[in-house]
From Swiss-Prot:
SUPFAM superfamilies the UniProt entry points to: Aspartate/ornithine carbamoyltransferase
Source organism of this protein record: Bordetella pertussis (strain Tohama I / ATCC BAA-589 / NCTC 13251)
Record-stated family: Belongs to the aspartate/ornithine carbamoyltransferase superfamily. OTCase family.
Localization annotation: Cytoplasm
EC number: 2.1.3.3
Key word Transport present: no
PROSITE patterns with a match to the protein in the record: CARBAMOYLTRANSFERASE
Pathway(s) per entry: Amino-acid biosynthesis; L-arginine biosynthesis; L-arginine from L-ornithine and carbamoyl phosphate: step 1/3
Record-linked Gene3D superfamilies: Aspartate/ornithine carbamoyltransferase (3.40.50.1370)
Keyword list, A-Z: Amino-acid biosynthesis, Arginine biosynthesis, Cytoplasm, Transferase
Binding site for carbamoyl phosphate: 61-64, 88, 112, 139-142, 268-269, 296
Record-listed L-ornithine binding positions: 170, 228, 232-233
Protein name (database record): Ornithine carbamoyltransferase
Length: 313
């Protein structure tokens, strides 16, 4: 095991989007471009050949697991996968003790769990960088991938408008952090009773956040339209109630037509065609969903590289 960075700098974590400065986000996105270009040219990029990633899953995953595991292997490292079923986490070991032990044996940890406070408790007792692979409150790796995908297809996101249609979940709160940091406007439209929590969002700067009761209005002129499932993990008991409440929040061709002519559509997946988005949209010409999914791999490689090696010359 090696020190957190080649510069022996302070220990850094990525638990929410605002843990990095705008300049650091820009650096990671630029490194993503370079790393992806190497990947497409089959050029090896193995700066983490002696590093080990521990992945801790307390929530099920497909894209998060595959992208982190493949990414670490592609950079020359190794991976240990832990779940509540095969570790002491499932037997009531305090997460602080788990952090103290795991972080003495690996170089970096990714956790996908429930409450944000849980990953914060882990990080506060870890000797190595910790990455949020998803919590109930935030999903920063996904938003990094989404922003990179927008830049890749349409250029800088500063000054643009992102329309979030659907549940005010971890994605929407992370989009808001990104908007505040990177200078774009976030339109949010949710059904009554599912709005952003005023206590959590505080008072965003003027022009950062606009909330709409009508999803069509939220899409008006948007450069990026995005959504997520109506029922997130942990809320399955509300599924039928949510289907009724969200019926008018299905992103369809009419909503995309209201957006900017060059607008793109994104979805963090898994998607339920006919619920939060129509098949026509997610499988249509404006959809960049599959590039978005692939880009989780590349941004997370850049993220791990940055947390372990610092900024490279």
């Amino acid at each position: 095991m090696t020190p957190p960075t080649t510069q022996n700098g302070p220990l850094r974590h990525f638990l929410q989007f605002k843990d990095f400065s705008p300049a650091e986000i820009a650096y990671v996105l630029e490194r993503t471009r370079i790393i992806k270009d190497k990947f497409k040219r089959y050029e090896p990029h193995m700066p983490l050949h002696d590093r080990t990633l521990a992945m801790v899953f307390e929530k099920a995953s497909t894209r998060t697991r595959v992208s982190f595991e493949a990414g670490m292997y592609q950079m020359g490292g190794s991976v240990i996968n832990l779940t509540s079923n095969d570790s002491q986490l499932g037997r009531s070991e305090p997460i602080e003790d788990t952090a103290r032990v795991i972080s003495r044996m690996v170089d970096i940890v990714m956790i996908r769990t429930f409450e944000q406070t849980r990953i914060e408790r882990f990080a506060s007792h870890s000797r190595v960088p910790v990455i949020n692979g998803l919590t109930n409150e935030y999903h920063p790796c996904q938003i990094l991938a989404d922003i990179f995908t927008y830049i890749e297809h349409r250029g800088p996101i500063a000054g643009k408008t992102v329309a979030w249609i659907g549940d005010a979940n971890n994605m929407s709160y992370t989009w808001l952090q990104a908007a505040e940091m990177l200078g774009f406007t976030l339109h949010v439209s949710t059904p009554a009773g599912y709005e952003l929590d005023p206590a959590r969002i505080g008072a965003p700067a003027a022009g950062v956040l606009k909330q709409f009761k009508d999803p069509m209005q939220a899409c008006q002129g948007a450069h990026l339209v995005t959504t997520d499932v109506w029922t997130s993990m942990g809320y399955e008991a509300e599924n039928e109630e949510r289907r009724a409440a969200f019926a008018d929040w299905c992103v369809d061709a009419e909503m995309m037509a209201a957006a900017d002519p060059q607008a793109v559509f994104m979805h963090c997946l898994p998607a339920h065609r006919g619920e939060e988005v129509t098949g026509e949209v997610i499988d249509g010409a404006q959809s960049v969903v599959w590039d978005e999914a692939e880009n989780r791999l590349h941004v997370q490689k850049a993220l791990m590289e940055f947390l372990l090696l610092g900024q490279l010359a």
